[in-house]
Amino acid sequence: MKIRRLFKYHSLKKKPIRPTWNKYNLYNLATAGREPRISGKTFFQQKWLAKSLTRAYHGEHIKERKWARMFSRRLPAVVNMDPAYMAKYNGSEQAAGRGSGLSEPPAYEKTADEKPAKQVIANPGRKVPTPYEQMTFAPLERRLDIAIFRALFASSARQARQMVVHGAVTVNGKKMKHPGYLLNPGDLFQVDVERVLYATGAPKDKKLLAAAMKAAKKELAEEAQEAAEEKDAEAEEAEEGEAQEAASKSGKKEKQVDTSKFDEAWNRKYELLQLQRLLQYAKHIADSPSHQLSATRKQALRALKRDIKAAIKQAQRRDGSVSPTGNVVDDLTMLLERLAVSPSKAIQQEEAAKELSKKLDKQSRQVLKKVIEYNDEHEDNEIDPSKPYMTPWRPRNYMSAFAFIPRYLEVNQNICAAVYLRHPVARPGESEVPSPFSPTINQLAFNWYLRRG
């Protein structure tokens, strides 16, 4: 897209209606008012105006010559027939005329005693006119990107096209990277759930997103550092094992070896193992949902994890000049036990909660029950700073004005999949092709493409 076009895409002066959920587009749609005046213009000018208005909404990202090849002058429609009417009549009454005696005779032949003739019965299903003009852009509804936008999996037709091009869409179980693919009745298309959550969810604040990215990078760096330290420790253990094997194979007892160094290395290794177990236990406490820690305890637990990591680094030094003593390990163990909640304390807390629930009145119990049900329903929708959209997830602003699904699509929002049931058709009084324009505008647009179809 050209940079110049970005400023005119949602022009508040010309007010073009676009296939997006943008707030400026909603403003243009709400303030559009009545249709532009076409009286006083030539027929060519009327058709040109209608074409420019409708093409801004229907397939505006598709080239004009490509749409001209897709255009079809056949407008699909169906007629609702009344079963009672079809069972009573066979259609001959529609062709009955004066020869059958069903029409009234001329006024000069009537007499005073003559009764009025029987009137021809019309089909009740044809009382409402069928808007054939609204089906002008029906061929575009078969496109994969337009179907994704109609199924509410994307906030605009261009975003739906981007999903297809980036390989986030499958048709009948196979990846489809062509946004212009024409769906057939019965085709199943599915979009990646994360892409749909990002496209239809509320955007995250830029400051929060930057902070989340910084925290994620820091966490990845810490994990990489821990993996490197574990790898170094394993390499040291392997070297010590090889040295011991070589010494045992030699079988030479030239001198009595001083075992103080080996004892020191063994003690350092034992303390390192204790520290690693402490670190695992601290991580278990932080990640376990059964340990309900307050904010201050969480801060203390983070500081403790940093101290344990620092002690591990000191214990892993080969020279052994600075090694943690047993007192450090004991102090860290005692501090960790203070932070953790023992099972007996957890049982006591549960019993206290039960006693408190007995003391609550009926209204408070109902409120508490609703809160618990809400938490159970939104258990999976938790705060996740790593996501690029707002968490807990909520729909995009101003989405309700565009939240409708055509009848020719069967959508399952849980798995972000939809079935293209059939081609859209026009019925008496309604059209299955969504359009913000009146039949008059669509009729003029149809006449514009009629000589080119």
From Swiss-Prot:
The protein's location, in the record's own words, is:
Mitochondrion
Q: Which SUPFAM superfamilies match?
A: Alpha-L RNA-binding motif (SSF55174)
Q: Which domain of life is it from?
A: Eukaryota
Which cellular component terms (GO) are annotated to the entry? mitochondrial small ribosomal subunit
Q: Which GO terms fall under biological process for this protein?
A: ribosomal small subunit biogenesis
Q: Name one Pfam family in it.
A: S4
Molecular function terms in GO for this entry? rRNA binding; structural constituent of ribosome
Acidic residues bias locations: 222-243
**What keywords appear on the UniProt entry?**
Mitochondrion, Ribonucleoprotein, Ribosomal protein, RNA-binding, rRNA-binding
Database matches in SMART domains: S4 (SM00363)
The annotated subunit structure for this chain is: Component of the mitochondrial small ribosomal subunit (mt-SSU). Mature N.crassa 74S mitochondrial ribosomes consist of a small (37S) and a large (54S) subunit. The 37S small subunit contains a 16S ribosomal RNA (16S mt-rRNA) and 32 different proteins. The 54S large subunit contains a 23S rRNA (23S mt-rRNA) and 42 different proteins. uS3m, uS4m and uS5m form the narrow entry site of the mRNA channel.
What biological function has been recorded for the protein in this entry? Component of the mitochondrial ribosome (mitoribosome), a dedicated translation machinery responsible for the synthesis of mitochondrial genome-encoded proteins, including at least some of the essential transmembrane subunits of the mitochondrial respiratory chain. The mitoribosomes are attached to the mitochondrial inner membrane and translation products are cotranslationally integrated into the membrane.
Q: Give the protein name, as stated in the record.
A: Small ribosomal subunit protein uS4m
Q: Which organism is it from?
A: Neurospora crassa (strain ATCC 24698 / 74-OR23-1A / CBS 708.71 / DSM 1257 / FGSC 987)
Which taxonomic lineage is given here? Eukaryota, Fungi, Dikarya, Ascomycota, Pezizomycotina
